Swiss-Prot record:
GO molecular function: ATP binding; glycine-tRNA ligase activity; protein dimerization activity
PANTHER family for this protein: GLYCINE--TRNA LIGASE, CHLOROPLASTIC_MITOCHONDRIAL 2 (PTHR30075:SF2), GLYCYL-TRNA SYNTHETASE (PTHR30075)
GO cellular component annotations of the record: cytosol
Domain of life: Bacteria
Protein name per its UniProtKB record: Glycine--tRNA ligase
Length: 1010
């Protein structure tokens, strides 16, 4: 970096000059309020259709909701984007971008440049693309995107967009911590020019904008866009769409558009942009696409090594797919896909090999196969065909069926005598009938030929969460493929994919060693890349990171264990370096969870905490992809400060907002459209509590009243709007700040956690969590939003397991069937003019929960037979009773095997007898009992009922008593003949057996493994 960094306007001039030299038209920013440079017609309209176009311009962008009254160091409602659009995308897209950074004085060897996954989309204009956020020492400075659709139209020709955050870059170059301190030119700062206006516009956008006027403007602009389109004027119509979009942004900032309405407004603007896009493409087509003559196409370049090699010995195989930076989450997916597909290809073609390994990093996926045989031998075999009589007529002519068969085999046969001319056909006699057999001789295929055909197909079959196209070849992959290495031993396999022919040339680390490198053989691959500063083994990179985290921890301060972040960091770097930075201690006063979210979600940093207290410390650990120096560390520290400042701003803003204001806002936030708002949900939870208190006295608590009242308040807070994963957690802080009961605050903080066994929750937190999940289950099942085998968008499976976990951990003795029946009364009986079936819905929910109960009991180490024995249709709907019954059965099996055998034997004997006998409808049981019947009835009458106390011990005692009863039953069965000729006596004895059988109804004893 030079001693005298560029002023903002000098930097802009330098970047524009760079792109002018690349052939870009230098536009001016558009003369309307746009939310981003993408809205400018030079991007939105020019990206449509097949015509090439290259442009660069500075776009003043208006985002009213991002205003911070001129006090935030780098968040503004009116800022600038330097936009570059390249259509079609050049092959050296990323290299051109990095060269533009060098032009403004950034020596990339001194910095940590990262390409972070960004699936960009703008729903308002129906635009989306795949690309990256570019981070400079932890600070996002640019967005790079390969557009895939604009105006909801898939693109004919892919455009590449570069959006420089020029204020942030200027802050970095000038070593400023606030945008307002940046030198605009040699005499004036950014703040002197814009800060007063920024404050004024924030006040207008948030506090004073005339919403009635802006609602009218929106309608007028939308109508004018439609009217203009009817006259075929797509360009003027688009201006009115831009105006409508800005009106919406003002209304959104004023908070006058609810969540439901917001979706509707966005959909309306998106519909308009689709109409504009269609109209614009039709208009350009009517002009015969005047710029199309400037386009060119790319074809694969033949090389001297484009001939398939002759391989005669066992050799190793290497396939490297070199691409622009893959998303960190895509690399492990690619590794799994490449390994699975490669094994499938090798197996399907009977290719012999000794071992297979797949390596992956951001810029490459590599397949290494050991000792691949040079040849595949397909052994000779015969295949039985049809009977000759079905193929030929008695005269020897081919029958219609024969014509069809021979055509399918590619054989020209018109008469029986023609068979002798074909060595691949033979006649065999099977069981006295003649059949035609197809003879397949031994075939030897070169492995190289198979790989030439299969490897390109393998790459195209790889599946990722999202794939893209980047040129006119139509090839799809997670990110643009820029090179292929395919070596069989020391020989090149010149496979072709799109415009690329494989070679032995790979590339080193983008910053540390960006040169082209030659791979001599698969055995040398890993070490050759290491010499070019690429650690291609993911296991080795992970080990480096884990060692670095330990090295930067101590007895007093250590990294907070975050396995997912370690995984992500492993696939964000090709040569990881671990270092440490710090931030101002003042931020440690913020909620710990907010600090962690800012560091992890936004910056990919590892937070640290004090080992003894668990309190967050002001040190963080960063994994770089370049050797850390003072510039890189200071840059990361400066990048974190604005993030924490923004978190602090949002948190303080929330603390200044009364909880009653949040509650009022819930009225405008839709829960489900058919079930009203989140406010309505809270009111329903209050009604649920009143019912629940009749099932458990614990629910009759003022602390629970307060927790329910405010449990959803933080959903409309500024912090949760930025970090949705902090909902509930922030609510706890806000309730404590409002001096509400600690028990209520803690419950709010607990109720949205993912709950697992062993996790401790407060009593109030347990009750609130349970009510919330039961309400969600009822709501979704009433609306028909039941999970499918592959789709569970509302996480109902998890919530059902959590219901069972909560009930089990707290031992709440509740009958879910009765409770759900009562809670269901708090929902409207008619949904969307249809009456929903209450009993059917509750049955479906119970069936769903019982399905999860099997999983839950399995996690508690109950055996399959024990689970099947207690989960019967007639079983109680009280999960605690079921779990206690299963535990008692488990104890019976382990400690009283003889008694268990008596029970099961007796049960099975009873069941067999009763299945063959029925009560006579013409005879009544006699009233005077014989001695044996009388004694047996006394035994049955004296037998204890089902346990009133819910505990495993009580159920075990019942089972032990049942074993004793079983002996009495056996004695009775051994001494009387049940099927007595006298119908009255037979009925009496059957009735006694039915009574006895009822004592066994707690379990399905046939399922128990004895």
């Amino acid at each position: 970096m030079s001693e005298h960094p560029l002023t903002l306007q000098s930097m802009i001039a330098t970047i524009l000059r760079f792109w002018s030299e690349q052939g870009c038209v230098i536009h001016q920013g558009y003369d309307l309020e746009v939310g981003a440079g993408t809205f400018n017609p030079a991007t939105f309209l020019r990206a449509l259709g097949p015509e090439p176009y290259k442009a660069a311009y500075v776009e003043p962008s208006r985002r009213p909701q991002d205003g911070r009254y001129g006090v935030h160091p780098n968040r503004l409602q009116n800022y600038h984007q330097l936009q570059v659009i390249l259509k079609p995308v050049p092959e050296n897209f990323l290299s051109l971008y990095t060269e533009s950074l060098r032009a403004i004085g950034l020596d990339l060897r001194d910095h940590d440049i990262r390409f972070i996954h960004d699936d960009w989309e703008n729903p308002t204009i129906g635009a989306w693309g795949l690309g990256w956020e570019v981070w400079l020492n932890g600070m996002e400075i640019t967005q790079l995107t390969y557009f895939q659709a604009i105006g909801s139209k898939p693109l004919d020709t892919i455009s590449g967009e570069i959006t420089y955050g020029i204020e942030r870059i200027a802050m970095y170059l000038q070593k400023k911590t606030s945008i307002y301190d940046v030198l605009w030119n040699d005499t004036l700062t950014y703040g002197q020019i814009t800060q007063a206006s920024e404050k004024a516009w924030s006040e207008y956008n948030f506090d004073y904008a005339n919403t009635e006027m802006w609602f009218k403007h929106f309608e007028d602009f939308a109508e004018e866009a439609l009217r203009t389109l009817k006259n075929g004027l797509s360009v003027p119509a688009y201006d009115f769409v831009i105006k409508a979009s800005h009106a919406f942004n003002i209304l959104d900032a004023r908070g006058t558009i609810s969540v439901t309405e917001r979706t509707r407004y966005i959909a309306r603007i998106r519909q308009l942009t689709r109409l504009v896009a269609d109209s614009y493409v039709e208009w350009r087509a009517s002009l015969n696409y005047p710029l199309l003559s400037l386009s060119s196409t790319s074809e694969p370049k033949e090389t001297s090594e484009s001939v398939v090699p002759m391989i005669s010995s066992t050799e190793d195989l290497l396939l490297e797919i070199g691409s622009e930076e893959l998303p960190a989450t895509f690399v492990p997916i690619g590794i799994q896909q490449l390994e699975s597909l490669a094994r499938q290809v090798l197996t399907d073609h009977n290719i012999v090999y000794e071992g297979l390994e797949v390596l992956g990093s951001p810029r490459r996926l590599a397949l290494l196969v050991k000792n691949v045989a040079p040849e595949v031998v397909q052994k000779a075999f015969e295949k039985k065909g049809p009977m000759l009589t079905s193929l030929f007529s008695p005269d020897g002519d081919v029958s219609p069926q024969g014509q069809q068969f021979f055509a399918s085999q590619g054989v020209d046969i018109s008469h029986y005598q023609d068979l002798s001319r074909h060595a691949s056909l033979a006649i065999r006699t099977v069981n006295g009938s003649e059949y035609l057999f197809l003879l397949h001789p031994e075939i030897r295929l070169r492995t190289a030929d198979i790989l030439m055909q299969e490897l390109p197909l393998l790459i195209q079959r790889m599946k990722f969460p999202k794939k893209m196209v980047w040129d006119n070849s139509g090839v799809e992959y997670a990110r643009p493929i820029r090179w292929l290495v395919a070596l069989y031993g020391e020989h090149i396999l010149p496979i072709t994919l799109g415009t690329i022919i494989a070679s032995r040339n790979s590339f080193g680390h983008r910053q540390l060693d960006p040169r082209k490198i030659s791979i001599s053989s698969p055995q040398d691959y890993v070490e050759t890349l290491r010499q070019a500063c690429v650690v291609v083994s993911q296991k080795e990179r992970r080990m480096i990171i884990e060692q670095g985290l330990r090295a930067h921890s101590s007895d007093t301060i250590s990294a907070i264990p975050l396995p997912r972040l370690i995984e992500e960091a492993t696939f964000l770097s090709e040569h990881p370096f671990v270092s440490c930075g710090q931030f101002s201690e003042q931020f440690c006063a913020l909620p710990k969870e907010l600090l962690i979210a800012e560091m992890v979600n936004h910056q990919k940093y590892f937070p640290t905490h004090e080992t003894s207290s668990g309190a967050i410390s002001n040190f963080f650990i960063v994994v770089c992809d370049n050797s850390p120096n003072d510039t890189i560390i200071e840059g990361n520290e400066k990048a974190l400060t604005p993030r924490l400042t923004d978190g602090e701003f949002l948190f303080k803003q929330d603390l200044q907002t009364p909880l009653t204001t949040f509650i009022e806002k819930l009225k405008s936030v839709t829960y489900f459209e058919a079930l009203g708002s989140l406010y309505d949900k809270v009111e329903r939870l209050k009604a649920h509590q009143r019912v629940f208190s009749t099932f458990s006295s614990l629910a009759a608590s003022e602390d629970l009243d307060i927790a329910i009242q405010y449990c959803k308040a933080d959903l409309v807070s500024a912090v949760v709007n930025e970090f949705p994963e902090l909902q509930g957690i922030m609510g706890e802080y806000y309730l404590k700040h409002a001096n509400l009961p600690t028990a209520s605050a803690v419950a709010v903080g607990e109720h949205l956690r993912h709950i697992t066994m062993g996790q401790k929750l407060s009593t109030i937190g347990t009750l609130l969590s349970l009510l919330d999940r039961l309400d969600n289950l009822l709501a979704c099942f009433i609306l028909g939003l039941k999970p499918t085998s592959s789709h569970d968008p509302y996480a109902l499976r998890r919530q059902s397991l959590e219901v069972l976990t909560l009930v089990s951990a707290s031992r709440l003795p509740i009958d879910l069937a009765s409770l759900l029946d009562r809670l269901a009364d708090h929902f409207p009986s008619t949904i969307e003019e249809k009456v929903w079936d209450k009993s059917k819905t509750i049955h479906e929910i119970l069936e769903f929960i019982w399905g999860r109960l099997k999983t839950f009991m399995g996690s508690l180490e109950f055996r399959k037979d024990e689970i099947a024995a207690v989960l019967i249709d007639s079983a109680t709907k009280n999960p605690i009773e079921i779990l206690d019954t299963a535990e008692a059965l488990q104890l019976l099996k382990e400690e009283h095997t003889e008694k268990l055998a008596v029970i099961t034997t007796t049960h099975n004997r009873l069941k067999k007898i009763l299945s063959s006998l029925k009560l006579s409808m013409t005879s009544s049981p006699i009233e005077v009992l014989g001695d044996r019947e009388s004694n047996f009835k006394q035994v049955l009458d004296a037998f204890p009922g089902f346990p009133k106390e819910t505990s495993a011990h009580a159920f075990l005692e019942y089972f032990l008593s049942l074993a004793d009863l079983s002996n009495d039953i056996q004695d009775f069965l051994n001494t009387v003949h049940i099927a007595n000729d006298d119908g009255a006596i037979r009925n009496l004895r059957i009735s006694l057996l039915l009574t006895a059988m009822d004592k066994f109804s707690l379990c399905h004893w046939e399922s128990v493994a004895v």
